[in-house]
Amino acid sequence: MKLVLQTANIVGDEKNCLYPNRAEVTSAEELQEAVKMDHVCAEYDNDYRSKENFRQSNVLVMDCDNDHTENPAEWITPEKLDEMMPDISYAIAFSRHHMLEKNGKAPRPKFHVYFEIEPTQDADYYAALKEAIYRKYTFFDDNALDAARFIFGADVGDAIWHEGWLTIDSEVEIGTPIERNDAGRVGNVIIAGTR
């Protein structure tokens, strides 16, 4: 498995759109190093992150914040993910809020799952694939399904490398786009930029 990420030269800047550093990741140790910086999972024209500049990707990231339930027994852990997806290739890096209280909610596992996919140059297909994964695995964050999503850098522990023999895109079906109401919401979630 080889995941291609693009990293920024900064950490924690949500307004940044420049990701000039290519990281070809082939191990947990390389992932752990790459995700210390803000990063994206696609290449963009002029290294400028936007859907319109999407050039290509061979990896997509899904966010698991475990905010789908307050019952700790129902929280997704790397071990549970391994049971659900034993044959699928992916890697895990913990988020900057892993096991920390946030917005008054109890500490819980929070991590990003980096799925290897067949390379694509189609931003709409890429976003549709993220929606298809969310439909099948609804514990993932439905607010992070676009083709220009960035991830805050974090240095919070060992990454996990799960080498499988399948890619996630061979395991999900792309259907119709997720319905969003007039406020940009899926259920009770407000989509970024619609407040």
Role assignments for model-derived ranges:
Residues 143-160:
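Short proline/glycine- and acidic-rich turn/helix-capping motifs at secondary-structure junctions
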Residues 23, 48, 130, 138-141, ...:
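Generic alpha-helical secondary structure signal
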Residues 78-79, 114-140, 159-180:
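Helical (often loop-to-helix) elements that flank the catalytic cores of nucleotide-handling enzymes
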Residues 1-111, 115-128, 186-195:
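Signature for HUH/AEP ssDNA processing cores
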Residues 50, 95, 141, 146, ...:
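Alpha-helix initiation/capping motif
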Residues 171-172, 177-195:
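Extended intrinsically disordered terminal tails
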